[in-house]
């Protein structure tokens, strides 16, 4: 069968990578070696003495034969010398001269091979030189024979719109630069998002996600999957956001009360000669991790069950089926294991930096990281509509990437808009709130108690994850506040970090061990560590004169002595449950990351209660 070849026009000088020398971030992250699939397709054969001998120079006869096989030319099997019919075919096309036909064991230079290939229907990129190795020729031929599709992908950006060099986050302006480079490099390009985009920082939350619509609409996304946190402002607001996007928001496993899909379930596009269908999924735990009022009347079904039904249907309508999922890598693996026919799953939700793609049951699984710390890239190579090559990974934060001026302007407009909105009053405190460094890192404070209590109150709305205790690292509390009105800006100065509320199961022994870490440096008056914990739902007594690790004398949870063997539900933040500040005992395999920042939680609590008057209640007592 005759193939329609794509144009390849540049004869390179030096290595292939020099085409994109202007950027260190262009080109596939892991170049695909074409000789593997070309050998499987019997385009290239080994020698009798074994091996492909790719280091040898390619002869005229070999080059013509490889082109003929690769392009599907109708060349009769030779009866005598193996190259005769290939040479006759090339001569009939005007690609080689009569003298060349008679001297197939010559070794043409790169420019001559390029001219021959062009006459035979395709153009090659070859390193310039008097001779070309078999390896270089096969690689160039593979590039010309395949349709190369590049996909950039993001997930769980959570409103981190600005560059943050301290936490190594690109921000959208620098992501835009990478996207533009990749799009210019390969016309067969898609940018996709796997959800949790509109919620997470003050820059998104203050306007229920609408503030960043101009940024997203300027980046050129193809489609996005709805993440669980897209529901945090209520599903009606989700639909409002969807309607203002210039690209579709897809989901196939959320249903309205009348049995119809809440969102369009799929997105189909043609790129690189492939008709690709994307199916969107969100975690079925969404009704647990968002407020129940946000999803009233909605049903969240198991993505595996939906995939079993929908993938075969989409394969009838498209060449390839991809999944755009916000269900976490474990569930992605489950889909791949149980449903055949999926080329690629672009995932999110579990914040898993898949630097190396996974392969399960023939399905590639990728996931970008979180908060714009990286940009995912996938390169797929198709031959005769078969996937024959794959490369994937992450381009992680690099300060040297330049910010795109257009997107940077849009980002700064959002920042300015939010700064103006931060003057709004959200509550009132009848007492001074004590959050100075020397207090929150050394003793119980009324502000620490207020924050811990707000966190416990929030968990009471998350069915099955109601916390017994709350642990707040003092280093995360950054300011005090005089009695009076509390504005958004006041609260943000107290809780400026985007740490999110996490919930974990821990034994009484784990909790006591955490308290030992909390008080291990409490006597360091001039260098107090931020690991000191403000607490809720519990109390304890410690003795600073005791050795480190033996200072906690008495612990009570809910007024009762702690049971070392009992499992308790602990609410804290993602920094602590990742083992930060030495809290390795709280780094568990199963952690619920709610996605709510401490700022979000405390603001909501304050808006509900309106007036606060927190006190010190002997939750933390030093034995004198």
Locate predicted features.
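N-terminal propeptides
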Residues: 1-146
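Generic alpha-helical secondary-structure signal
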Residues: 66, 115, 140, 178, ...
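Acidic/histidine-rich, surface-exposed loop or edge segments in extracytoplasmic proteins
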Residues: 67-71, 152-163, 426-438, 493, ...
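Acidic helix-start/capping segments at beta-turn-to-alpha-helix junctions
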Residues: 80-89, 194-199, 474, 478
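Feature captures C-terminal
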Residues: 88, 150, 160, 170, ...
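Acidic, metal/ion-coordinating pockets
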Residues: 146-402, 409, 442-457, 463-470, ...
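Hard-cation-handling environments
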Residues: 405-486
